[in-house]
């Protein structure tokens, strides 16, 4: 019991000197001839009561009264505070790390907690220091600032129902926006066409010659480039194809050109669409033309080649050659 409660650094020499003083009894009190049974009459040196031992409040002994607990060495309070409290620069670095990162670092907290002990003073200091660090971090942490709003007004948002009413309402016209460049090009083309028409009208007014074809006025400019063509036998102006005649190529209409090629073109022949056609003198049938020629022969009027040519080419015919 004694060995377990004393520390190892206790001065044993002084302890045994005190024992010698206690053992120094006067000689008159001791009987020379005492037996074994008289041993109970001697006063006991060691007391079994714990009250004679130093109290728990003695600074040489620890505050733990359990017999099973290990012996503890007394250390002054100032030394404990120095060991428990880390240097100031360590705390500053920890606070800076917390300010830089929004989440607390577990490694720094573990390294900071290894300096702590189980004393109540250290627990109070640790709680106060942790509260100070949390207050500082809560003040220093920057907030998430959003982007500043611009002063430009936003366009008004139209409702979908209003848009549908405007598009699908009573007035179903759709407004199409045309780019300005396209409009400018279109206006330029219109101006060019107007200038060309003005030039043509000025040239026609300067010449002063107008022709009427089917009730339409034709400028002299167009009549000079494209003259009106007529068939030299029947004076037809419209035909699907112009053919070769006695006056050159493209001088006869299609019907007269076919008969001229086969040698059956006579003065009595006229197409039904010819403006010079008279039923008493002309016909578009080859049989009737042959009968008419036979009557003339029987009457004594002989038909010569000159008469054929005069019948072939009218005097008032307009000759147009490309």
Curated annotation (Swiss-Prot):
Keywords: Activator, DNA-binding, Metal-binding, Nucleus, Transcription, Transcription regulation, Zinc, Zinc-finger. A motif (Nuclear localization signal) lies at residues 147-154. Its main location: nucleus. The keyword Transcription applies. Residues 102-141 have a biased composition (Low complexity). PANTHER family: GATA TRANSCRIPTION FACTOR, GATA TRANSCRIPTION FACTOR 8. This is GATA transcription factor 8. It comes from Arabidopsis thaliana.
């Amino acid at each position: 019991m004694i060995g377990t409660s004393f520390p190892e650094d206790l001065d044993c020499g002084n302890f045994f000197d005190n024992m010698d003083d206690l053992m120094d009894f006067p000689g008159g009190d001791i009987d020379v001839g005492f037996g074994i049974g008289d041993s109970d009459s001697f006063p006991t040196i060691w007391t079994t009561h714990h009250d004679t031992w130093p109290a728990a409040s003695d600074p040489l002994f620890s505050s733990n009264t359990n017999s099973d607990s290990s012996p503890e060495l007394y250390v002054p309070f100032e030394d404990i505070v120095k060991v428990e409290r880390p240097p100031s620069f360590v705390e500053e670095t920890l606070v800076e790390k917390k300010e830089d990162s929004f989440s607390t670092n577990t490694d720094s907290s573990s390294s900071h907690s290894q300096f702590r002990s189980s004393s109540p003073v250290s627990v109070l200091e640790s709680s106060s220091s942790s509260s100070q660090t949390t207050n500082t971090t809560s003040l220093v942490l920057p907030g998430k600032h959003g982007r500043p709003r611009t002063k430009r007004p936003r366009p008004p948002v139209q409702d979908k129902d209003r848009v549908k009413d405007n598009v699908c309402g009573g007035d179903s016209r759709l407004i199409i926006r045309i780019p300005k460049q396209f409009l400018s090009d279109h206006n330029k083309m219109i101006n060019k066409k107007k200038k060309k028409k003005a030039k043509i009208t000025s040239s026609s007014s300067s010449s002063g010659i107008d022709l009427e074809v089917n009730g339409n006025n034709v400028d002299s400019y167009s009549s000079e480039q494209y003259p009106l063509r007529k068939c030299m036998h029947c004076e037809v102006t419209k035909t699907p194809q112009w053919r070769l005649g006695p006056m050159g190529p493209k001088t006869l209409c299609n019907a007269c050109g076919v008969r001229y090629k086969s040698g059956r073109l006579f003065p009595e022949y006229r197409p039904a669409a010819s403006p010079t056609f008279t039923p008493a003198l002309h016909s578009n049938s080859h049989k009737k033309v042959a009968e008419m020629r036979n009557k003339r022969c029987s009457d004594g009027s002989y038909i010569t080649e000159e008469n054929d040519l005069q019948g072939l080419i009218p005097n008032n015919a307009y000759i147009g050659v490309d």
